Swiss-Prot record:
Mg(2+) binds at residue 153. NCBIfam families: IPP_isom_2. Its EC number is 5.3.3.2. Keywords: Cytoplasm, Flavoprotein, FMN, Isomerase, Isoprene biosynthesis, Magnesium, Metal-binding, NADP. The gene is fni. Pfam families: FMN_dh (PF01070). This is Isopentenyl-diphosphate delta-isomerase. It catalyses: isopentenyl diphosphate = dimethylallyl diphosphate. It comes from Bacillus cereus (strain ATCC 14579 / DSM 31 / CCUG 7414 / JCM 2152 / NBRC 15305 / NCIMB 9373 / NCTC 2599 / NRRL B-3711). The keyword Magnesium applies. Its cofactor is FMN; NADPH; Mg(2+). InterPro entries: Aldolase_TIM (IPR013785), FMN-dep_DH (IPR000262), IPdP_isomerase (IPR011179). Homooctamer. Dimer of tetramers.
Amino acid sequence: MVRAKRKLDHIEYALSTGQSRTHGFHDIDFVHQSLPNSNYDTITCETKIGELSLSSPIFINAMTGGGGEKTLHINEQLAYVAKHHNLAMAVGSQMAALKDESEAASYKVIRKVNPNGIFFANLGSEATIEQAERAVDMIEANALQIHLNVIQELTMPEGDRDFTGVLQRIEKIVLNSKVPIIVKEVGFGMSKETMQQLVNVGVTAIDIGGQGGTNFAAVENERRQRMLSYFNNWGIQTATSIIEATSTNNNLSFIASGGIQTALDVAKAIALGANTTAFAGYFLRILMQDGIEKLVDEIELLHTDLKFIMTALGAKTIEELQSVPLVVKGETYHWLMQRGIDTAHYSRR
């Protein structure tokens, strides 16, 4: 019951705390092209995460599950939206259902709604090989997300305090998994050092989960008697984390998430090097406040606007969008210079 109550608290406080931190995309400017030689009607948005082919560079990221009927209904609605737009979708952490079988229905519902969809299972980095297998089987997942959430756990009143052996557990799951593994942050971003460590143990897909979206330190602080307010502004902004990711020069697939709300955010994330982008809190807020049809309409507009932007840039495909010229400026530029990451190649390609 404690875990289920926490799931419901997360939804409540995620909606009430909002997405107030900046994601850094205001520091990214496209170089305008007056002769784009493009046609809106022939723009295509297909992309890939590793070997998984996706019809859109937008997917519905992990949100919830394991909190009884309310979370079942949310996942049911999100699965309907995913089916309508042919989007991939991730579920929230399934540890609740591994601990309490009665919660499994809140995850399994997505396959009932969308039998042929692309779905990602989800567990924390404390998971064992056996738990990873059960989570994948539970929803017949196409991939497994393993989330890294150190700051959330430290801020969570009942959270973990021991983070030893995480990399070794991830390596074991990678070596034994029948589906691809995606390692993701939950809103605090990933450094190039973290990504290199993950590459070294065989990880091939990463969701950088940058600062700018749902702030899980703020969410957990709402549940504390004594706030750990110093964690509320902790992390690496989304735009910065994407560039840190690409600087590793590894054959990784990158997912950009963390405060992405507009088609311009999507376009900038992809142009910086992401293969796809993920929405969570923004979609949840629309669903809970305005309803499912409004969310369906919003995603339609996102795709329309993304194609407008690609047309303006002369990018006929997602791959071409990844090579358009842009300029990195402001706080993002200064951070990257301090980190020894040159951004000049973005403006000269």
